[in-house]
């Protein structure tokens, strides 16, 4: 990335992250059966240390989870430098918040996504390449 264009990359990353977070957590809470469509075919999810890869396995995993209600507190994002992902527009998105799964107490969580831009003739769609979810249990 040329330094003169860096602000453009940051603005693009922030817009993409904001749109993505709205779509992702609405889909997770209300249309979970569609959630795996947000992932690349080769994407990997690490959920509290347990890895799940591929859209079919992701779909099965998400369907197993109890219904949820996510509340987002913090969203941070940054473009990933071209040297790390040559010829691929990539964004790191970090989310902190709380979630209540049906039958469980509300818990804090941290989630990190690597998103990549998938261009088609009509538009650009951001897909999840990597997803890492962790419950945050604070020491007392």
From Swiss-Prot:
<dbReference type="Pfam" id="PF02136">
    <property type="entry name" value="NTF2"/>
</dbReference>
<dbReference type="GO" id="GO:0006611">
    <property type="term" value="P:protein export from nucleus"/>
</dbReference>
<dbReference type="InterPro" id="IPR045875">
    <property type="entry name" value="NTF2"/>
</dbReference>
<keyword id="KW-0813">Transport</keyword>
<keyword id="KW-0007">Acetylation</keyword>
<dbReference type="GO" id="GO:0006406">
    <property type="term" value="P:mRNA export from nucleus"/>
</dbReference>
<feature type="domain" description="NTF2">
    <location>
        <begin position="16"/>
        <end position="135"/>
    </location>
</feature>
<dbReference type="GO" id="GO:0044613">
    <property type="term" value="C:nuclear pore central transport channel"/>
</dbReference>
<comment type="function">
    <text>Stimulator of protein export for NES-containing proteins. Also plays a role in the nuclear export of U1 snRNA, tRNA, and mRNA. The NXF1-NXT1 heterodimer is involved in the export of HSP70 mRNA in conjunction with ALYREF/THOC4 and THOC5.</text>
</comment>
<dbReference type="GO" id="GO:0031267">
    <property type="term" value="F:small GTPase binding"/>
</dbReference>
<keyword id="KW-0539">Nucleus</keyword>
<dbReference type="GO" id="GO:0005737">
    <property type="term" value="C:cytoplasm"/>
</dbReference>
<dbReference type="GO" id="GO:0005654">
    <property type="term" value="C:nucleoplasm"/>
</dbReference>
<keyword id="KW-0963">Cytoplasm</keyword>
<dbReference type="GO" id="GO:0005634">
    <property type="term" value="C:nucleus"/>
</dbReference>
<comment type="subunit">
    <text>Heterodimer with NXF1. Forms a complex with RANGAP1, RANBP2/NUP358 and NXF1. Interacts (via NTF2 domain) with NXF1. Stabilizes the NTF2 domain of NXF1 by heterodimerization. The formation of NXF1-NXT1 heterodimers is required for the NXF1-mediated nuclear mRNA export. Preferentially binds Ran-GTP. Associates with NXF2, NXF3 and NXF5. Does not bind nucleoporins (NPC) directly, its association to NPC is mediated by NXF1.</text>
</comment>
<dbReference type="InterPro" id="IPR018222">
    <property type="entry name" value="Nuclear_transport_factor_2_euk"/>
</dbReference>
<dbReference type="GO" id="GO:0005829">
    <property type="term" value="C:cytosol"/>
</dbReference>
<protein>
    <recommendedName>
        <fullName>NTF2-related export protein 1</fullName>
    </recommendedName>
</protein>
<dbReference type="InterPro" id="IPR002075">
    <property type="entry name" value="NTF2_dom"/>
</dbReference>
<feature type="modified residue" description="N-acetylalanine">
    <location>
        <position position="2"/>
    </location>
</feature>
<dbReference type="GO" id="GO:0016973">
    <property type="term" value="P:poly(A)+ mRNA export from nucleus"/>
</dbReference>
<dbReference type="GO" id="GO:0042272">
    <property type="term" value="C:nuclear RNA export factor complex"/>
</dbReference>
<dbReference type="InterPro" id="IPR032710">
    <property type="entry name" value="NTF2-like_dom_sf"/>
</dbReference>
<dbReference type="GO" id="GO:0016607">
    <property type="term" value="C:nuclear speck"/>
</dbReference>
<keyword id="KW-0653">Protein transport</keyword>
<dbReference type="GO" id="GO:0005643">
    <property type="term" value="C:nuclear pore"/>
</dbReference>
